[in-house]
């Protein structure tokens, strides 16, 4: 039983040291100069156009029954999709769920191998 505790403690200490080493790594050098530029440029807002999201023809807030609303409906509703509905299963292989399945397999194999150390 004592040997198992030593292995667990050693593993936890190893992970802690590894985490501290990763957190303490120096940042990569940047190509930008360390001094501030001698001339400052004023910050300018982009001009508002009809293509900007959330703009209407007037300054008044649009009412729900108004034809001049900026958003057709709540995000994710059928009216907000229009002709651009949610994508099908064509990109399902590139989704995060596939990566989650791989990590679940790795965790399962690791737990089985780890059980041999304790039993």
Curated annotation (Swiss-Prot):
Primary location class: membrane
Expression across tissues: Expressed in mature pollen grains, developing microspores and tapetal cells.
Extracellular side: 24-98
Biased composition (Low complexity): 24-42, 82-95
Residue stretches of biased makeup (Acidic residues): 56-69
Topology within the bilayer: Single-pass type I membrane protein
Domain of life where this protein originates: Eukaryota
Keywords: Developmental protein, Membrane, Signal, Transmembrane, Transmembrane helix
Signal peptide (residue range): 1-23
Region (Disordered): 24-95
GO-annotated cellular components: membrane
Record topology, Cytoplasmic segments: 119
Positions of transmembrane segments: 99-118
Localization terms from the record: Membrane
Role played: Required for pollen fertility and development. Active in both diploid tapetum and haploid microspores. Major pollen protein.
Protein name in the entry: Anther-specific protein BCP1
């Amino acid at each position: 039983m004592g040997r198992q505790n030593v292995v667990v403690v050693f593993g936890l200490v190893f992970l802690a040291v590894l985490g501290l080493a990763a957190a303490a790594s120096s940042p990569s050098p940047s190509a930008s100069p360390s001094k501030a530029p001698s001339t400052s440029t004023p910050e300018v807002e982009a001009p508002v156009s009809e293509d900007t999201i959330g703009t209407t023809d007037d300054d008044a807030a649009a009412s729900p029954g108004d034809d001049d609303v900026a958003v057709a409906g709540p995000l994710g509703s059928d009216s907000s999709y229009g002709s651009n509905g949610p994508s099908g299963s064509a990109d399902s292989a590139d989704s995060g769920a596939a990566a989650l399945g791989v990590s679940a397999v790795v965790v399962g194999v690791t737990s089985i191998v780890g059980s041999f150390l304790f039993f």
